[in-house]
């Protein structure tokens, strides 16, 4: 079974535990797994995850057009979520937040008036830049997410033994052929497959480069 381990989870935990925590914006290119990682983080570290996607819900978009009051917004979000949103116990996820400038701007009011609520947002780099007119400067935390690293690729491909070996060797050391050949093979695969999670998942399951190429063309 494919298991996606991203080291950015450690940074998300630090954000959760910080007493200076502000609403978080997780930035990065499309298709690198921002939504997946935020949901995974929420499921592992909170009692509930209230997920809202601005790309698919016009009513949600209109909600933020009608009020800037965090208490009113939370009341309506709880209704949509179907249960109470509890400070510190429910992670609120705003996905594709760049699609709703009013929601992006509302983060300022959440930081000032309702900072006890944990809010994490996912957005594309370009979309957030284009929303600069309503950007809550100084009122949010940022975290940049990138495609999977070689180490993350190895873990996804069930090669934890190679990861542990790489940790154990000195910066300048002769690598025995038994490890060197495996590392070289995996590194070549990583250069071809890349670090997009969907492509990596398909590669670990099928080991078929043609299928992977089809995925890459559609990313």
Locate predicted features.
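Short regulatory helix/loop adjacent to the ATP-binding pocket of P-loop NTPases
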Residues: 109, 127-143, 154-159
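Conserved lysine of the Walker
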Residues: 34
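N-terminal pre-Walker A segment at the start of P-loop NTPase domains
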Residues: 1-17
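Hydrophobic positions on the alpha1 helix immediately C-terminal to the Walker A/P-loop
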Residues: 37, 41
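Hydrophobic anchor at the beta1->P-loop junction of P-loop NTPases
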Residues: 26
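Short glycine-rich substrate-engagement loop in P-loop NTPases that contacts/grips substrate
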Residues: 56-88
């Amino acid at each position: 079974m494919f298991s996606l381990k991203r080291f950015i989870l450690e940074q998300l935990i630090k954000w959760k535990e910080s007493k200076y925590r502000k609403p978080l914006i997780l930035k990065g290119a499309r298709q690198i797994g921002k939504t997946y990682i935020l949901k995974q983080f929420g499921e592992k570290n909170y009692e509930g995850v209230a997920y809202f996607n601005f790309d698919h819900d016009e009513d949600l978009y209109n909600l933020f057009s009608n009020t800037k009051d965090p208490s009113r917004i939370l009341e309506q979000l709880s209704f949509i979520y179907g249960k109470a949103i509890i400070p510190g116990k429910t992670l609120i996820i705003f996905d594709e937040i760049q699609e709703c400038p009013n929601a992006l701007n509302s983060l300022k009011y959440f930081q000032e008036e309702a900072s006890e609520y944990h809010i994490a947002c996912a957005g594309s780099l370009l979309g957030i830049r284009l929303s600069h007119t309503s950007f809550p400067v100084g009122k949010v935390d940022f975290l940049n997410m990138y495609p999977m690293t070689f180490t993350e690729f190895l873990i996804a491909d069930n090669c934890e033994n190679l990861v542990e070996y790489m940790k154990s060797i000195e910066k300048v050391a002769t690598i025995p052929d038994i490890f060197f050949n495996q590392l070289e093979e995996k590194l070549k695969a990583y250069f071809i497959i890349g670090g997009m999670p969907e492509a990596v998942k398909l590669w670990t399951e099928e080991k078929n480069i043609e299928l992977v190429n089809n995925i890459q063309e559609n990313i």
